[in-house]
Amino acid sequence: MGNTCVGPSSAADRHGFFHSVSLAVLWRPGGRAEPSQPPGYPPRESSHSSVTSSTAPERVTIADSDLSSSTPNKGGNKPKVRRVQSAGLLADSVLKRDSERLKDLYTLGKKLGQGQFGTTYQCVEKATGKVLACKSIAKRKLVSEEDVEDVRREIQIMHHLAGHPSVVSIVGAYEDAVAVHLVMELCAGGELFDRIVQRGHYSEKAAAQLARVIIGVVEACHSLGVMHRDLKPENFLFVNHKEDSPLKTIDFGLSIFFKPGENYSDVVGSPYYVAPEVLMKHYGREVDVWSAGVIIYILLSGVPPFWDESEQGIFEKVLKGDLDFSSDPWPAISDSAKDLVRKMLNRDPRKRLTAHEALCHPWVCVDGVAPDKPLDSAVLTRLKQFSAMNKLKKMALRVIAENLSEDEIAGLREMFKMLDTDNSGQITLEELKTGLRRVGANLKDSEITTLMEAADIDNSGSIDYGEFIAATMHLNKVEREDNLFAAFSYFDKDSSGYITQDELQKACEEFGIGDAHLEDIIKDIDQDNDGRIDYNEFVTMMQKGNNPLGKKGQGQLSFGLREALKLG
């Protein structure tokens, strides 16, 4: 193989078009995820759609109440973190060192994105005028010692991997009274699947170039003792919009340092990309190769290898589902590509390719055997649909919640007041944890965080009254005809009997939702292909996948806020 099986360099990656694809997560009562059927794809047992944004979406933590620490046999006590209860801030330093003031060195600009723990801004270095990104993590949201350790570890890992051409460069970490600020390289070039779709042509050779970047990052992490644990397309961004823009990995929030031979049990990651041994709570670094294999499968076909209409269904497919190499476009894809994917998605981690072996595979290596002929145009269509989330259902649930009578929601209103201990009109993560414990819910912090993320429609970091009602109202209210019609009428501004793209755009603006790829939302729901959503199509969308999963138990890993609060 000579010198062909080496990690990707900026020169080798010039024609890769990396961007991030958002995991398809549809809002459902109780915070469960529901993918929808991608049009134009042969019928399967399940379906999928997703959200695309200018920033990487929140990662999903697949929680389990019986999990042990992510690092086994840690030994010793964690440092005590003193809290100022009145202010909700960490009194001790997160960084454990004196820090220069961020505002003395940088000027903060526009907000680029917001997640559960932090907000990312564009910032400018005063001394040089260089444009960078600043991720500000609110210290009031670091409510446990584990949260603080996670932030410290993320910073350590980013410094540890510094210098790799496909890892975002960290410039510095700063701390003040209210937040920890991570200043890093700005990746403004957009997301993987969007870039592919924009170009309008796509070949196996191009997919192999992208695969080389992904696998190269995995190899670099493993060689430096880092397990990523959350590899997915949305964790890769282009630096700029140029044709030869480098592709960078941007998120190490779930990454850990590992020791060869040790096994880990925290069930973390994102449903479509999680390895089977993670679900079995006994795994090592091989999980990253599995996740990379899933991404490559999607790059070649436009759909994930394992999907279903519920997270539980996805997990069952991951554990025992068959790989589909018979449906289009797989018959036209080279045997070498299928060989790589099959070996990366071997359920036995001992037989799975290592990252280095995958990087040396003939289909991946520089000047390898990947053909340059275009892939089926349907792949581009599916990639586009895979990267657009149906946010309409989330908004519709909120509309229904806000139109319920006082009698219907009286009990939920009192529950909201009970949780909102400071009467701010917002339930914070800490308030949710306290409230759930008061009602006897035996949930781990990671599980409660998952509930929070699902209920927080606008990603503000807290749950307002409308979001709370939407997350906890009973399913029979969602499916009641008068409520469905009222919700439809809210979007149908001109009472034409149809929801148009312009009307959907206005609704997104009212809800504070950014670019939602409206054409793809409509296409996903529009069964008669007239470019509009009629009432029957709207009702079908609202009723699809509403079978409750129930609280997590022996065979279930998903649960909803309604169940957690014991509301039946």
From Swiss-Prot:
Lipid sites, type N-myristoyl glycine: G2
GO cellular component, one term: cytoplasm
EC number: 2.7.11.1
Amino acids binding Ca(2+) 3: D492, D494, S496, Y498, E503
Record's keyword terms, sorted: ATP-binding, Calcium, Kinase, Lipoprotein, Membrane, Metal-binding, Myristate, Nucleotide-binding, Repeat, Serine/threonine-protein kinase, Transferase
Domain annotation Protein kinase: ranges: 106-364
GO biological process, one term: intracellular signal transduction
Tissues where the protein occurs: Expressed in roots, leaf blades and developing seeds.
UniProt cross-references to Pfam families, sorted A to Z: EF-hand_7 (PF13499), Pkinase (PF00069)
GO molecular function: ATP binding; calcium ion binding; calcium-dependent protein serine/threonine kinase activity; calcium/calmodulin-dependent protein kinase activity; calmodulin binding; protein serine kinase activity
Chain residues that bind ATP: L112, G113, Q114, G115, Q116, F117, G118, T119, T120, K135
Protein name: Calcium-dependent protein kinase 17
Organism: Oryza sativa subsp. japonica
Source taxonomy: Eukaryota, Viridiplantae, Streptophyta, Embryophyta, Tracheophyta
